[in-house]
């Protein structure tokens, strides 16, 4: 009998060691220590998004989609998009992800669902201004 191990791809737009360590620890805790972590990182994506003020219609969006496809090519069973500033790119490829059979999950999705469930008015605090609009859009979407 073949040993089946979960492969989770973590897609980062930052190479902050503390963030990577924290996320990998939490993912391992939630999916098991025998899971394989695929870590894909491109800090130029977030740098470009910060400079432009948004992710849509940028080369950064194309590179991020390329990272999702690289995760699929490496055999990922699921992809976790770590950056809220680019979460709408993950949203935009959900139909393709369904066809491929590899879900792309936003790190902030459940937080937004819970905020929408619990409150009539939701405040958003962020470390980057580029996170505000995508997060507000996600809260509005999941509240419907």
Description of each model-found segment:
Residues 1-144:
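Non-catalytic structural scaffold of enzyme domains
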